[in-house]
Design a protein with these regions (language model features):
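Gly/Gly-Pro-rich "capping" loops immediately C-terminal to redox-active cysteine motifs
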Residues: 27, 43-77, 98-102
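Flexible coil segments in periplasmic/lumen-exposed cytochrome c-class electron-transfer proteins
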Residues: 31-32, 40, 88-134
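Generic structural signal for secondary-structure transition and capping sites
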Residues: 42, 67, 84-85, 120
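A short, structured beta-strand/loop element
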Residues: 80-81
């Protein structure tokens, strides 16, 4: 198990290095691909905890007031790449599309790194622990 955690940490740091080497700006990528739904300040949509008229939840905030930090890196990556419905399954419907066809893996990781960089240390520590438990 420790070997898997070490491997996951190594791969995550490698992806970050690739993103930095390729000059990827996670904040700019977020603004281009995510801000239209999740807000330019990561604030999400109003009443994000209540179902809308279409029966779907509005886009949640990605700042410390939301729940993004409650999830480990793997699930955050898969939701971003494949879309929420594909990851959650069971007929769950979501407006969150997958970006696997339009963003490279390193770009997705750069966006997630940007989001995580905005959280206070308490939320970052909790999220790191969740990642290690995956």
């Amino acid at each position: 198990m420790k070997g898997l955690i070490a491997l996951a940490a190594l791969l995550a740091s490698w992806a970050q290095a690739v993103a930095a080497e390729e000059g990827m700006d996670g904040a700019a990528l977020y603004q281009q691909n995510c801000a239209s739904c999740h807000g330019t300040e990561l604030q999400g949509q109003p009443d994000w905890r209540s179902l809308g008229p279409d029966g779907r939840l509005p886009a949640p905030p990605h700042d410390a007031t939301g729940h993004t930090w409650h999830h480990g890196d793997d699930i955050l990556f898969r939701i971003t790449r494949d879309g929420t419905a594909a990851v959650v399954g069971g007929g769950y419907e979501s407006d969150m599309p997958g970006f696997g066809d339009s963003l490279r893996d390193a770009e997705i990781r750069a966006i997630l790194d940007y989001i995580k960089s905005t959280w206070p240390e308490r939320e970052r520590a909790y999220q790191r622990e969740r990642t290690q438990q995956e």
